[in-house]
């Protein structure tokens, strides 16, 4: 396993990659599992709760996630070719952050429940309902697979503020 560099919006080449639509994976192979293991190690190191493959420069439809609270045992989850089958009409607002938009958080409204289908680490197809933080996180990460960042859901003013804050934080570092 290896920690990979996380692409960020303040780098033009990184942003171009982050805006790419990720391609579906044909099968869960040992090579793909190695990528998922690297992604998980990278996410834990950052630290974060979710990471899409495109965020480490691999534009394929793969997500890793761990929603365990601090002090709880790790509970890694793997999502290959995830797709939303159904979404609730009711929305929930949640303050989101992103490893590719460092040091910036803002509220985004998303459906409060979604039903999704994906392949897991073993390549088995799973259908599952997500709600709460799980629903927020899976939708946020699935946006990455479409080349969409959480700040793209914000008004132009708030998006510009986010970019300015990220650039300022990078200069200070």
Swiss-Prot record:
One of its GO terms (molecular function) is peptide deformylase activity. GO terms for biological process: co-translational protein modification; translation. It comes from the Bacteria. Its EC number is 3.5.1.88. Pfam families: Pep_deformylase. InterPro entries: Peptide_deformylase, Peptide_deformylase_sf. Binds 1 Fe(2+) ion. Keywords: Hydrolase, Iron, Metal-binding, Protein biosynthesis. It catalyses: N-terminal N-formyl-L-methionyl-[peptide] + H2O = N-terminal L-methionyl-[peptide] + formate. Fe cation binds at residues 98, 140, 144. The active site is at residue 141. Its cofactor is Fe(2+). Removes the formyl group from the N-terminal Met of newly synthesized proteins. Requires at least a dipeptide for an efficient rate of reaction. N-terminal L-methionine is a prerequisite for activity but the enzyme has broad specificity at other positions. Belongs to the polypeptide deformylase family. This is Peptide deformylase. The lineage of its organism: Bacteria, Pseudomonadati, Pseudomonadota, Alphaproteobacteria, Caulobacterales. The gene is def.
């Amino acid at each position: 396993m290896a920690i990979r560099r996380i692409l960020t919006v303040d780098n033009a080449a990184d942003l171009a990659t982050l805006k790419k639509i990720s391609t579906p994976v044909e099968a869960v192979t040992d090579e793909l599992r190695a990528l998922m293991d690297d992604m998980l190690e990278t996410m834990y190191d950052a630290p974060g709760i979710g990471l899409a493959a495109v965020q480490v420069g691999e534009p394929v439809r793969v997500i890793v996630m761990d929603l365990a609270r601090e002090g709880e045992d790790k509970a890694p989850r793997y999502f290959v070719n995830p797709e939303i089958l159904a979404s609730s009409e009711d929305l929930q607002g949640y303050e989101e952050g992103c490893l590719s938009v460092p040091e910036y958080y803002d509220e985004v409204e998303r459906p409060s429940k979604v039903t999704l289908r994906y392949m897991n680490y073993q390549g088995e197809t799973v259908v599952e309902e997500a709600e709460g933080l799980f629903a927020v996180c899976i939708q946020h990460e699935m946006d990455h697979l479409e080349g969409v960042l959480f700040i793209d859901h914000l008004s132009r003013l708030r998006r510009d503020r986010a970019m300015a804050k990220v650039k300022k934080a990078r200069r200070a570092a």
